[in-house]
């Protein structure tokens, strides 16, 4: 459900890909219920993709969420990203590689608005980086396809899989012609969006709307106590 507008600004100096062999491919900073780690926990995660035809061992490489601390977490042992394949690092704070599953020594909080994933090789040279832009519950952000150049939004995250189902961004939040409150008589409610191409769906019973809810086609009458919720798709 796309209910609010997120301002997404990717600064050029925070999104670099100097060598192109290993890239940050996808991440979720809101993994509440979509992907479990090897301990059965829903930890946030970052996915790397090896664009080359050879396996790459990240032993001694660095990953951080703070650009001013690029060596915050060093891969403590061998961690292979196979040729043309993806690998997940869980941002759990556990600081381990156990059975080929990697856990960084830090957690991420997307509401801080100042976190940036930075991947560096063993010499400390930055290989890739990307700002942690907020997303809704269990959504992710990633390249439109594995290793692609365009960053997109995924309402169904694709950890350890091909990036598919990319969306450009959330649609703007719908507007209501009336505010919440008590009214002495019936009235017509108008829903609108700043996006002329948006389709608005709504419910009148307080349930969470999606694109199977009522499609808004024009003002509708409210004559009894109702809880109206709306979502825009574009």
Annotated model-derived regions:
Residues 1-22:
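Bacterial Sec-dependent N-terminal signal peptides
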Residues 3, 61, 214-217:
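Composition- and surface-driven signal marking solvent-exposed, interaction-prone regions
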Residues 3-8, 99, 134, 176, ...:
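Short linear sequence motifs
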Residues 8, 31-34, 47-49, 127, ...:
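Residue-level detector of functional hotspots within protein domains
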Residues 11, 37-39, 54, 108-110, ...:
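Sterically constrained small-residue positions within well-ordered secondary structures
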Residues 19-153, 212:
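Activation on beta-sandwich/Ig-like modules and their edge loops
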Residues 139-234:
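Short, compositionally stereotyped local motifs that mark structural "simplifiers"
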């Amino acid at each position: 459900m796309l209910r609010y507008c997120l301002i997404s600004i990717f600064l050029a100096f925070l999104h670099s890909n100097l060598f192109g062999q290993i890239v940050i491919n996808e991440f979720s900073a809101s993994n509440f219920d979509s992907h479990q780690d090897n301990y059965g926990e829903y930890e946030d995660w970052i996915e790397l993709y090896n664009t080359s035809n050879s396996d790459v061992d990240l032993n001694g490489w660095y990953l951080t969420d703070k650009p001013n601390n690029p060596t915050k977490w060093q891969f403590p042992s061998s961690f292979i990203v196979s040729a043309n394949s993806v690998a997940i690092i869980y941002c759990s704070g556990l600081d381990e590689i156990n059975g080929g599953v990697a856990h960084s020594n830090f957690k991420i909080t997307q509401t801080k608005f100042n976190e940036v994933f930075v991947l560096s090789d063993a010499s400390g040279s930055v290989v890739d980086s990307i700002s942690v832009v907020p997303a809704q519950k269990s959504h992710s952000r990633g390249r439109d396809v594995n290793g692609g150049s365009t960053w997109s939004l995924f309402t169904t995250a694709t950890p350890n899989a091909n990036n598919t189902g990319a969306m450009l961004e959330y649609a703007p939040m719908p507007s209501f012609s009336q505010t919440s409150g008590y009214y002495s008589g019936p009235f017509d409610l108008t829903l609108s969006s700043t996006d002329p191409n948006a389709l608005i769906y709504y419910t009148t019973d307080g349930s969470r709307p999606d694109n199977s809810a009522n499609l808004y086609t024009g003002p509708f009458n409210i004559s009894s106590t109702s809880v109206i919720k709306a979502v825009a798709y574009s």
